[in-house]
Amino acid sequence: MAMTGLNTAGSDRDYDTQSLNRELQDKGFLLTTTEDLINWARTGSLHWMTFGLACCAVEMMHTSMPRYDVERFGVAPRASPRQSDVMIVAGTLTNKMAPALRKVYDQMPEPRYVISMGSCANGGGYYHYSYSVVRGCDRIVPVDIYVPGCPPTAEALLYGILQLQRKIRRTGTITR
């Protein structure tokens, strides 16, 4: 039974939408928004680019191998930043390499995401107190997901990629 009245306009609209949705589903149609459709497509077709600077890059390669096969989740590697949605920064970022990282990030199309992989990329790691090390790649580019570890396992990176997909589904791409 539907509620009616001055203060229940939202409830009436929700009830009408739900009944319309059920009726269309019975006939084989799907009722959704454009934003939900875009988010669904974006999470299923992420293209990542490696920015491997040290030993974490080896674990990044393991993620693409047959044991973990990250491509089954709709994530595929790309060689060019212009074709990439996600940049995975893995390893120690030095002051000399920081401008190159920013340049590659700026070449990526919007919306773009960054995964910081390993202790060195997250906060400088073992070389934190060195004069030539940037203490976290988040000082150069905005980071969406941090994957801890030295080096993090392929499972940890895979979990980080899945968390990024959840974040995209939750926050959306139009409002980012």
Curated annotation (Swiss-Prot):
Binding site for [4Fe-4S] cluster: 55-56, 120, 150
EC code: 7.1.1.-
Annotated InterPro entries: NADH_UbQ_OxRdtase-like_20kDa, NADH_UQ_OxRdtase_20Kd_su
GO-annotated biological processes: aerobic respiration; electron transport coupled proton transport
UniProt entry tagged with the keyword Nucleus: no
Subcellular location: Cell inner membrane
Domain of life: Bacteria
Catalysed transformations (reactions): a quinone + NADH + 5 H(+)(in) = a quinol + NAD(+) + 4 H(+)(out)
A family per Pfam: Oxidored_q6
CC terms in the record's Gene Ontology section: plasma membrane; respiratory chain complex I
Enzyme class: translocase
UniProt cofactor note: Binds 1 [4Fe-4S] cluster.
GO MF term set: 4 iron, 4 sulfur cluster binding; iron ion binding; NADH dehydrogenase (ubiquinone) activity; NADH:ubiquinone reductase (non-electrogenic) activity; quinone binding
UniProt keywords, alphabetically: 4Fe-4S, Cell inner membrane, Cell membrane, Iron, Iron-sulfur, Membrane, Metal-binding, NAD, Quinone, Translocase, Transport, Ubiquinone
Cofactor(s), names only, from the UniProt record: [4Fe-4S] cluster
Membrane topology of this protein: Peripheral membrane protein
Free-text function comment from the UniProt entry: NDH-1 shuttles electrons from NADH, via FMN and iron-sulfur (Fe-S) centers, to quinones in the respiratory chain. Couples the redox reaction to proton translocation (for every two electrons transferred, four hydrogen ions are translocated across the cytoplasmic membrane), and thus conserves the redox energy in a proton gradient.
NCBIfam families reported in the protein's UniProt record: nuoB_fam, PRK06411.1
Subunit structure: NDH-1 is composed of 14 different subunits. Subunits NuoB, C, D, E, F, and G constitute the peripheral sector of the complex.
Similarity comment: Belongs to the complex I 20 kDa subunit family.
Name used for this protein in its record: NADH-quinone oxidoreductase subunit B 1
Species name: Cereibacter sphaeroides (strain ATCC 17023 / DSM 158 / JCM 6121 / CCUG 31486 / LMG 2827 / NBRC 12203 / NCIMB 8253 / ATH 2.4.1.)
